[in-house]
């Protein structure tokens, strides 16, 4: 049957409806319950290094991270947390801080009540919160401290530190089953059960769903998709997405984007982190940028103006369009922190920097402002289009500088004080 004979019920392209979850407030940030999908990140500083951690949280926040997780692994780190919070507040930064606890979180939160108060959310790993007869007691201790301080909790299972007693139990049951499942399927079930059983236990202690976020991270793309599909189908807790140990560079970006993109398209996920291994001395804010670009590319949110640029081919032997596209993109990234306040709505701007006559004029017309640079053998002229209309033709060695000035002028007139109100639909 021809596809046109059986059209889709909805002609509007887009993701599936968001999975209905219970909204959780983390500081002043809403997670789940239909709220915009939240971008978060994690520091890699020694939390006991107060100034270093303040500086990195500030950079992550400025880059667009809406929540930042910090490691709280020992006494010195726990003692530093309130000073970190206070130092950030002095800079005007109110980004919620999440404490990442393993093994001794119950003790650190009890011994350092100022730490418990300063954090906005506690992350509990059900695989190492305690072992054997201590597990329930230590888990209960953290939940009760969260209740006392009115804090949110993320119950985050991870298959690198999965609850071994639960996994062994499920493996033993599977071994004697008449229809045994694949070992990886049993491991995925253990991940989901670990999160859900812990959440049920937290509710028994008194922690409401409005204070709980769940995650179940693995490092395999296909397993991650299956785990979160299962988790979402069996609960309405707010969900944090992330591919653990995604890796470095393009590999980590591609793997995380593939996994999270599929889940987001299916309506699953209330907050995300792109867990990238930074290059030595690399910029930690890259994971924030990638998370934002994923959400913006898929149409969930807008963070910064988009710069469209053609990939280049034999018609574009000049590097001018590439250099201009990079220059405009970098310029926008640098200016966005100030622009957010000065030019409300500027994040919806679309800029096109094209390299030849084939797609250049058409793509430039689709953008708010676009330029079509000449390709090899073409007339050395670059038409500029504003809101679909050709307004000027640039020539000579100052094309790049002139176009950047036109972009700035467009922003000032479109989004500056006194400009008409701009909506995302525009």
Curated annotation (Swiss-Prot):
Disulphide bridges: none
Gene Ontology biological process terms in this record: isopentenyl diphosphate biosynthetic process, methylerythritol 4-phosphate pathway; terpenoid biosynthetic process
Keyword Ligase: no
Cofactor: how bound: Binds 1 [4Fe-4S] cluster.
Pfam families found in the cross-reference section: GcpE
Enzyme Commission designation: 1.17.7.3
MF GO annotations: 4 iron, 4 sulfur cluster binding; 4-hydroxy-3-methylbut-2-en-1-yl diphosphate synthase activity (ferredoxin); 4-hydroxy-3-methylbut-2-enyl-diphosphate synthase activity (flavodoxin); iron ion binding
Family affiliation: Belongs to the IspG family.
Protein name per the record: 4-hydroxy-3-methylbut-2-en-1-yl diphosphate synthase (flavodoxin)
């Amino acid at each position: 049957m021809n596809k046109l004979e059986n059209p889709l019920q909805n002609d509007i392209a887009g993701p599936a409806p968001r999975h209905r979850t219970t909204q959780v407030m983390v500081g002043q940030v809403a997670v789940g319950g239909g709220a915009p999908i939240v971008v978060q990140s994690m520091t890699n500083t020694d939390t006991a290094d107060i100034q270093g951690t303040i500086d990195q949280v500030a950079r992550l926040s400025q880059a667009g991270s809406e929540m930042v997780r910090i490691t709280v692994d020992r006494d010195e780190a726990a003692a530093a947390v309130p000073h970190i919070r206070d130092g950030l507040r002095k800079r005007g930064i109110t980004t919620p801080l999440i404490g990442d606890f393993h093994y001794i979180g119950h003790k650190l939160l009890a011994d350092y009540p100022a730490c418990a108060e300063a954090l906005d959310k506690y992350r509990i790993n059900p695989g190492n919160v305690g072992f054997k007869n201590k597990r329930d007691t230590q888990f209960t201790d953290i939940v009760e401290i969260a209740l006392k301080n009115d804090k949110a909790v993320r119950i985050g299972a991870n298959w690198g530190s999965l609850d071994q007693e639960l996994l062994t139990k499920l493996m033993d049951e599977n071994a004697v089953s008449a229809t045994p499942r694949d070992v990886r399927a049993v491991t995925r079930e253990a991940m989901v059960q670990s999160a859900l059983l812990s959440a049920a236990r937290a509710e028994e202690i008194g922690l409401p769903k409005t204070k709980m976020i769940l995650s179940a991270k693995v490092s395999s793309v296909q397993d991650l998709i299956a785990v979160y599909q299962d988790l979402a189908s069996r609960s309405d807790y707010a969900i944090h997405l992330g591919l653990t140990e995604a890796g470095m560079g393009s590999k980590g970006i591609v793997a995380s984007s593939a996994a999270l993109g599929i889940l987001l398209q299916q309506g699953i996920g209330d907050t995300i982190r792109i867990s990238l291994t930074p290059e030595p001395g690399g910029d930690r804010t890259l994971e924030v940028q990638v998370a934002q670009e994923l959400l913006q590319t898929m149409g969930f949110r807008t963070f910064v103006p988009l710069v469209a640029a053609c990939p280049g081919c034999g018609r574009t032997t000049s590097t001018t369009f590439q250099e201009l596209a990079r220059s405009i993109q970098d310029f926008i990234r640098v200016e966005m922190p100030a622009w957010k306040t000065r030019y409300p709505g500027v994040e919806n701007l679309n800029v096109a920097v094209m390299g030849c006559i084939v797609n250049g004029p058409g793509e430039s017309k689709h953008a708010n402002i676009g330029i079509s640079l000449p390709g090899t053998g073409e007339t050395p002229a670059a038409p500029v289009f504003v809101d679909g209309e050709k307004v000027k033709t640039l020539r000579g060695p100052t094309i790049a500088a002139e176009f950047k000035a036109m972009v700035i002028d467009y922003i000032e007139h479109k989004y500056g004080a006194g400009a008409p109100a701009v909506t995302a639909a525009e």
